[in-house]
């Protein structure tokens, strides 16, 4: 039985630096950074005082006052970004609602909403006991990440499978990977899938306590510097990216614009440590499995969209994994980290990086690694420093690594240049 192939026919992105895939791509292709001093709360108690904040107002982006009151910032991101349906040109009304599904990835859920509500019911933390009378009726929405999938399903009229994936920083890749499998097996006709996180609040800033985030704040624009010898942690970001996924031949029949085919996906875990990483073997295995599913040889990978968080450990771990999986071709393949420009939005970043990968093929441009001036000697691959590179891109490997040992890989190929 021939396996159904899955295409991306719609993309929408909300990221630091702009709402919309065009603004997002312009920032990446120009190598600009969106990092600044934190404005959402007073960061004085924390080592890290910079973040990549998104300029966003729900009311200015089509949400009603009632929706803004009901939804946490992350849920608002998800609903607005689910407008990828519009980009796809897909007539969802032509499909039975139960043949349309939703998968949303998120690492930390509605942390900003929870933090705000705690401040209200505790009088800014001054009360020994919280006063539940001040709790908003929709507080439950903040407590359950499943509300993200529910809000997106309501927004697009999906009555098929609807679920949330929470695998730390690989959530965005895993959410799309699971959605691809549902289309492949014929359970649905269309999936709206992606990931979201809005973690810039004191709650996720406890990452500061384990020194995962950078303390560099004297020059915010240069704070995120993956693979550089002076890197000292990542910059927290926020955002969302969502996709419309359809069976490839069906999308071609209706004349859809096809950004990419998702040809391979795999995930592994190291069963080792919550934050520690070993020698890259598990990520390398995920890469090999994704390439096998895509029926690609290592030599056919044109670009690697790295996890590239900017921690000493992760960047070296990834470099080792690429060498294990691709062999000598790793040295000939451009690798870059867009976290150098848009920060690390935890569960959302995997989907944001999938969007960047698809757009790299759309425009035949490899985005750069910003702020890479002095490469770490142990990170000795081609990390596309500072400036984007024009080159033909027919296939992209994008990878993610998450706390808990999660390692995921996805292969995108150019369906536009394939007649199969």
UniProtKB/Swiss-Prot annotation:
PROSITE patterns: KS3_1, KS3_2. It comes from the Bacteria. Keywords: Acyltransferase, Antibiotic biosynthesis, Transferase. Signal peptide: none annotated. GO terms for cellular component: cytosol. Residues 3-414 form the Ketosynthase family 3 (KS3) domain. PANTHER family: 3-OXOACYL-[ACYL-CARRIER-PROTEIN] SYNTHASE, MITOCHONDRIAL, POLYKETIDE SYNTHASE-RELATED. Belongs to the thiolase-like superfamily. Beta-ketoacyl-ACP synthases family. This is Putative polyketide beta-ketoacyl synthase 1. It comes from Streptomyces virginiae (Streptomyces cinnamonensis).
């Amino acid at each position: 039985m021939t396996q159904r192939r899955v295409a991306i026919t719609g993309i929408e992105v909300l990221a630091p630096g702009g709402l919309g895939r065009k603004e997002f791509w312009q920032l990446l292709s120009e190598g600009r950074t969106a990092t600044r001093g934190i404005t959402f709360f007073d960061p004085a108690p924390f080592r890290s005082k910079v973040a990549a904040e998104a300029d966003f107002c729900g009311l200015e982006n089509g949400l009603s006052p009632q929706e803004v009151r009901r939804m946490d910032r992350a849920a608002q991101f998800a609903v607005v970004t689910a407008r990828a349906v519009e980009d796809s040109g897909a007539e969802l009304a032509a499909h039975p609602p139960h043949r349309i599904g939703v998968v949303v990835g998120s690492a930390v859920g509605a942390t900003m909403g929870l933090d705000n509500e705690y401040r209200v019911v505790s009088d800014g933390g001054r009360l020994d006991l919280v006063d539940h009378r001040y709790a908003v009726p929709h507080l439950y929405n903040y407590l359950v990440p499943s509300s993200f999938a529910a809000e997106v399903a309501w927004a697009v009229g999906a009555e098929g499978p609807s679920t949330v994936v929470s695998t730390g920083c690989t959530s965005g890749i895993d959410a799309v990977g699971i959605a691809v499998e549902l289309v492949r097996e014929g359970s649905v006709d269309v999936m709206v899938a992606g990931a979201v996180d809005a973690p810039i609040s004191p709650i996720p800033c406890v990452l500061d306590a384990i020194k995962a985030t950078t303390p560099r704040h004297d020059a915010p624009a240069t704070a995120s510097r993956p693979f550089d010898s002076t890197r000292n942690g990542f910059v927290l970001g926020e955002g969302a990216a969502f996709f419309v996924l359809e069976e490839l031949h069906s999308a071609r029949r209706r004349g859809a614009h096809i950004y990419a085919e998702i040809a391979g996906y795999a995930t592994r875990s190291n069963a080792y440590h919550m934050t520690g990483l070993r020698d890259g073997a598990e990520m390398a295995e995920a890469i090999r499995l994704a390439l096998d599913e895509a029926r690609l040889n290592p030599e056919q990978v044109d670009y690697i969209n790295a996890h590239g968080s900017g921690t000493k450990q992760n960047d070296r771990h990834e470099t080792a994994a690429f060498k294990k999986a691709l062999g000598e071709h790793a040295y000939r393949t451009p690798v870059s980290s867009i976290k150098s420009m848009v920060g690390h939005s935890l569960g959302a970043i995997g989907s944001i990086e999938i969007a960047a990968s698809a757009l790299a093929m759309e425009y035949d441009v490899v985005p750069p690694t910003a702020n890479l001036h002095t490469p770490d000697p142990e990170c000795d691959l081609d990390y596309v420093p500072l400036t984007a590179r024009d080159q033909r891109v027919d296939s992209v490997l994008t990878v993610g690594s998450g706390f808990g040992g999660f390692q995921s890989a996805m292969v995108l190929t150019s369906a536009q240049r394939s007649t199969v």
